[in-house]
């Protein structure tokens, strides 16, 4: 349940809801995607999944791996779609150099958080994240349960 389909016409395409459970998100960035035509059509239909995807820095460039864009049956016949191909992310040079430094030296990781439309272009929100330990996950769950219980009591009382 880590990717969520959006209603047709809304800006949100897919979310990686599992990322906030697995990581502390320190910083959020917006990146463009290099896509093929059939991928854009799939995104417009809401056929994207970020569940097991990750961002990797290679040769001074950011790449999205493991994201699944399901091809539409009406896609072009002369194109062989690869649903899980690696996709290049478009970031400014300063952002890339800063991210490379933080990922390599400080032990952070880059996690895709959500995929959405902005002014007719597909954008990916990536998070600079630090992994949670098991006790951190338990504490976060306990905090979430307490907030929910507090809201329940406030509504009744």
Curated annotation (Swiss-Prot):
Gene Ontology MF, one: RNA binding
Gene3D superfamilies: 2.40.280.10
Cellular compartments annotated: Cytoplasm
A family per Pfam: SmpB
Bias type Basic and acidic residues, positions: 137-157
GO BP, sorted A to Z: trans-translation
Family: Belongs to the SmpB family.
Entry protein name: SsrA-binding protein
Encoding gene, per UniProt annotation: smpB
């Amino acid at each position: 349940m880590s990717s969520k389909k959006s209603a047709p016409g809304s800006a949100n395409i897919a979310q990686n809801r599992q990322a906030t459970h697995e990581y502390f998100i320190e910083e959020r960035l917006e990146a463009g995607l290099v896509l093929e035509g059939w991928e854009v059509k799939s995104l417009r239909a809401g056929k994207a999944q970020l569940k097991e995807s990750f961002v990797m820095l290679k040769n001074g460039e950011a790449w999205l791996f493991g994201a699944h864009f399901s091809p539409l049956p009406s896609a072009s016949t002369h194109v062989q779609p690869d649903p899980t191909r690696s996709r290049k992310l478009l970031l400014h040079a300063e952002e890339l150099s800063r991210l490379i430094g933080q990922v390599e030296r400080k032990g952070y990781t880059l996690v895709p958080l959500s995929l959405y439309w902005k002014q007719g272009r597909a954008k990916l929100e990536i998070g600079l994240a630090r992994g949670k330990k098991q006790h951190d996950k338990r504490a976060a769950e306990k905090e979430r349960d307490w907030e929910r219980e507090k809201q329940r009591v406030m509504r009744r009382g």
